[in-house]
Design a protein with these regions (language model features):
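Aromatic-acidic/polar surface patches that form glycan- and anion
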Residues: 85-89, 133, 161
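Conserved short loop/turn motifs at secondary-structure junctions
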Residues: 84, 98-100, 128-129, 156-160
């Protein structure tokens, strides 16, 4: 089996001698504030020992620290939901932008007003950027359906963001 494209090896695969670690990419190219040295690194391994050594290696070079995930599936799922959450938030603001336009309200004016509350997340309407933000939700959709659940919200957000160019 796999999650996010990475085969999962365990004792049932007769790969007891295979050791590998996993640490999802978390950088944002071009972002001058959030550099690799200031982003906590999620680490994992296919065994507890490998996980320890992967975490030890990254903790020696990442100043912000590390988070040693329980296993590779947890680390992979964390990466997928980071991007899926961003996709969902962009879909929300894109849909609100369509609604506000029909109501003759400037979306950016609304966002500027809403930003005055400390816990508002100021997403801007537009296309989803990055090479994985628009793709990772489909991995989660696939694994959800494989597990017997239809993730309607994920389908809706992808539909909204895929059609934003029409508006």
């Amino acid at each position: 089996s796999s999650f996010a494209g990475l085969p999962i090896y365990d004792d049932t695969n007769n790969c007891r001698s295979l050791a590998f670690g996993y640490s999802p990419e978390r950088i944002n190219p071009g972002d001058k504030e959030h550099k690799i040295s200031s982003i906590i690194k999620v680490t994992s391994g296919n065994t507890e020992n490998v996980s320890y050594w992967v975490d030890y290696l990254y903790s020696s070079i990442i100043k912000a620290g590390t988070h040693n995930a329980k296993n590779i599936k947890v680390a992979e799922a964390a990466k997928v939901i980071e991007n899926t959450q961003r996709d969902l938030n962009i879909a929300l603001i894109n849909e609100l932008s369509i609604v506000f336009k029909k109501m003759n309200i400037d979306t950016l004016d609304v966002i500027n007003a809403a930003e005055t509350k400390w816990n508002f997340l100021p997403f801007k309407p537009g296309l989803v950027g990055g090479h994985c933000i628009g793709v990772d939700p489909y991995y989660l959709v696939h694994k959800s359906e494989e597990s017997g659940y239809i993730p309607n919200l994920l389908y809706s957000s992808r539909s909204i963001n895929n059609s934003v160019a029409d508006f």
